[in-house]
Every structure is written in structure tokens, then in C-alpha cells.
Amino acid sequence: MVKNTDDVSVSTPAKEGIMQGNGAWCVVGFPPCKDNKCYCCIGGRTHARYSTMAECRHACF
């Protein structure tokens, strides 16, 4: 049985990011960047951490 994670209440830090048409996101405040000091590429061609949004967008999209 697959559990629907939408029903789970989880406290997450505020996230900000930019999404591209391919579904990739660069976000801050998302693990492993919980301290809001780096940007993470989610759903893109990399899953690395970057120090700036510009670096993340260039690598991720």
C-alpha cells in the first residue's frame, strides 16, 4: 500500500525558488540546505548544492 504523504503534517522552513518548464526547481531552505545558506537543484539534471541562485539555475536547468 502506498502512503499519501500529503496527509502528513511536517514543519518545513520557508522555501523560495524558481521553477523551469521541465519541472526542475532551485530552492533555498530544502534539505540538505536546511540552514538557508545554499540552493539545491530539485528535479533537474543535477542534485547538488550551490552558493547562489545563479549557479544553481545554470547547473540545474
Swiss-Prot record:
Keywords of the record: Disulfide bond
One family name in Pfam for this protein: Meg
Tissue localization of expression: Ubiquitous.
Chain coiled-coil ranges: none
Record-annotated disulphide pairs: C38-C60
InterPro entries: Meg (IPR056205)
Family that this chain belongs to: Belongs to the MEG family.
Identification of the protein by name: Protein MATERNALLY EXPRESSED GENE 6
Source organism of the structure: Zea mays
Classification lineage: Eukaryota, Viridiplantae, Streptophyta, Embryophyta, Tracheophyta
Gene name linked to the record: MEG6
